[in-house]
Amino acid sequence: MVIIADSGGSKIDWRLLKKDGTIGQASSSGFNPYYQPIDHLKKIISEALLPQVSERVSKIFYYGTGVSSDKNVQSIQSVFAEHFPQAESEVGWDLLAAARALCGHEPGIACILGTGSNSCLYDGEKITGNVANLGWILADEGSGTYLGKQLIFDYFRKEMPESLAKQFHARFPWSREEVLEKVYQQEKPGAFLASFAKFIFQHLKEPYCYKLAYKGLSDFFENNVMKYENYKNLKVHFTGSIGFYFSDVLRQVANDKGITVKNILEGPIAGLTLYHQKDL
């Protein structure tokens, strides 16, 4: 059996590839070693994963956030070694998950467009380039946070069309002070800002919302994809909620810039399941 984990801060998607070709699955709360103790992962494995394991585990592929340090990688591997001492384990970051899920064994540019954004150059086996990720305050172009931040800016600065502003206020009747408190004083401000992307998507037929989305995605291409050498000769792929739901706008922006977009997935787990069939 091969176990695959796609881990984010809020949830982990598990897939269990069995010798007979069937695929088991499980879902659990998320894990980030920078913010949660390693015992949290142990509990997740015991409660959510182990009940689904019905045969010997030979390999484990764990992709997630917070695995940039060797210490965190070793901590995660040690937990798997406790539960599956006979299994080999590989721990990789979420960008590698995106590259493998989207590109498979072909070279290309893999992008994440969700709450945040990121991209990498992939040679078919490994990541060979990455435009520096500066987070939601400095960058994250095209992300839900980026779009939501612009929407909030336009609303309070009265740049949003009046009819749309009335609809926005009816749905989010917050004062400027309440919004500033959520952004500057409460937890997960990026996720809060990204939550407004749904409003943009639901009003994409409004010229204002379409232009906002187009501009945000154009900024992503210009500051990420177009920084890679030879980008026009490579296929560009996307995963993440913004890439998935705004795919029509995304493809239009790419077409206008002479860029070829191929795969767009809401999440990487299905692509990872296909990629790791060879490891059975």
Can you name each region flagged by the protein language model?
Residues 61-68:
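Polybasic, low-complexity association/targeting segments
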Residues 65, 94, 241:
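Cofactor-binding loop segments of dinucleotide-utilizing enzymes, especially the Rossmann-like FAD-
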Residues 68-163:
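Phosphate-binding/catalytic loop of phosphoryl-transfer enzymes
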Residues 1-60, 102-109, 152-280:
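ATP-binding/phosphotransfer module of carbohydrate and carboxylate kinases, centering on a glycine-rich
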